[in-house]
């Protein structure tokens, strides 16, 4: 297939957290607000003259300094952010808005405040107290946290407009990006998709890490380009799979999987599109902030939720996504030492295979994908096993 017009430009943008578009927005007087978790509503960080940046630390090398401050037994994603912060890579930030969801990430982000890692006198760090259940009481608590620890500090420190009208405008702009990426994602359902998982991963990551008002036109143009794009006559993939798990902020992971012969047709991981790129529908009978809060709590698929309906809902979602996108198997991945996904992938991969009949493989990995020969071998073996199952099905065997 012909390369997408903006693919190379987007790839270059993802090489740095402080990329040229972030620099442009800051030069225009806008405030860069960093976050790392789905539970920090992205849309709230794009209200008024603010824009959201989901923190990444691309091209990270040694983690010696962050390991000194934390531990060798902490996931590399958390340590990479701290390492980059110590290097001075996040001095463009106006605030860091975090959630008490992952204790490892909390320890990493606390150091931004303790070590004064951002050279900005007005810079502040805030943590939301997150509930473990979704009830009317927990929604009220979540709304209160968002108001007291996000909206009010932004208004008091930077004079940000956090009125209901400003929130509605932010939701409308957020939904436009979501509609574009959702429509692009529909092409992944085709028998011979006209977009690869790597390309979609790039587009989605850019929407998380760059000011949306500076990329929405290019995303819209990319959608039009894809509508006209013809897929390769002979598919370059051998099987289609879903990837489920913890943070994948490195598109090199998706590239590695696809080079092994498995086309990634659906993603259910942090930094992915499910959840993350659904439109937010405001309930006219509820306050705007409560509608936003309910959206994020109810759509979250984080394994920190232990309600029975939430646990079973995560399994059923993966099953339904595989059916909808015609995925033949599921790759469950977990960052090494990830406290939540370490439990989730073990049980979920068993349930998906033995209860739902969908082949799966479970792997743990380092944050940096480059040169990971062991992971490549695991994926290749999984691809071959799926091909064997296909042949057996065609021959009527088991």
Q: What are these model-predicted stretches?
A:
Residues 3, 346-398:
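Peripheral docking tails and interdomain loops at the edges
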Residues 85, 309-326, 344-347:
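A short, acidic, amphipathic alpha-helical segment used as a generic capping/interface helix at domain edges
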Residues 34-89, 93-95, 100, 108-109:
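An N-terminal, globular interaction/scaffold subdomain
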Residues 80-153:
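Acidic/His-rich segments in extracytoplasmic proteins that coordinate ligands and/or metal ions
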């Amino acid at each position: 297939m012909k390369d997408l017009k903006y693919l190379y430009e987007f790839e270059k943008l993802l090489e740095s957290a402080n990329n040229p578009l972030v620099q442009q927005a800051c030069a225009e007087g806008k405030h860069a607000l960093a976050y790392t978790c789905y539970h920090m509503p992205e849309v709230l960080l794009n209200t008024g003259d603010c824009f959201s940046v989901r923190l990444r630390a691309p091209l990270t090398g040694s983690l010696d300094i962050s390991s000194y401050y934390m531990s060798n037994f902490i996931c590399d994603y958390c340590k990479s952010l701290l390492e980059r912060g110590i290097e001075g890579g996040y001095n463009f930030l106006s605030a860091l808005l975090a959630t008490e969801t992952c204790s490892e990430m909390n320890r990493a982000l606390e150091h931004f405040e303790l070590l004064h890692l951002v050279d900005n006198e007005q810079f502040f760090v805030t943590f939301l107290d997150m509930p473990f259940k979704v009830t009317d009481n927990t929604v009220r608590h979540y709304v209160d946290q968002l108001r007291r620890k996000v909206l009010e500090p932004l208004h008091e420190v930077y004079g940000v407009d956090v009125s209901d009208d400003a929130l509605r405008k932010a939701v409308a702009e957020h939904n436009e990006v979501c509609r574009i990426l959702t429509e692009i994602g529909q092409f992944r359902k085709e028998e011979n998709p006209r977009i690869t998982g790597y390309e979609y991963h790039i587009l989605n990551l850019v929407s998380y890490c760059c000011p949306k008002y500076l990329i929405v036109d290019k995303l819209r143009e990319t959608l039009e380009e894809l509508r006209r794009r013809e897929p390769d006559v002979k598919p370059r993939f051998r099987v289609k799979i879903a990837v489920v798990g913890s943070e994948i902020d490195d598109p090199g992971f998706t590239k590695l999987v696809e080079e092994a012969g498995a086309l990634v047709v659906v993603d259910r991981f942090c930094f992915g599109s499910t959840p993350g790129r659904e439109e937010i529908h405001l309930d006219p009978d509820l306050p705007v902030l409560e509608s936003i809060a309910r959206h994020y709590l109810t759509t979250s698929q984080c394994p920190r939720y232990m309600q029975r309906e939430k646990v079973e809902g995560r399994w059923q979602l993966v099953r339904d996504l595989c059916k909808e996108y015609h995925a033949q198997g599921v790759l469950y991945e977990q960052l090494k030492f990830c406290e939540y996904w370490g439990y989730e992938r073990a049980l979920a991969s068993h349930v998906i295979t033995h209860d739902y009949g969908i082949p799966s493989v479970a792997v743990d990995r380092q944050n940096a994908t480059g040169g990971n020969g062991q992971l490549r071998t695991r994926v290749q073996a999984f691809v071959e096993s799926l091909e064997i199952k296909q042949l057996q099905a065609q021959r009527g065997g088991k």
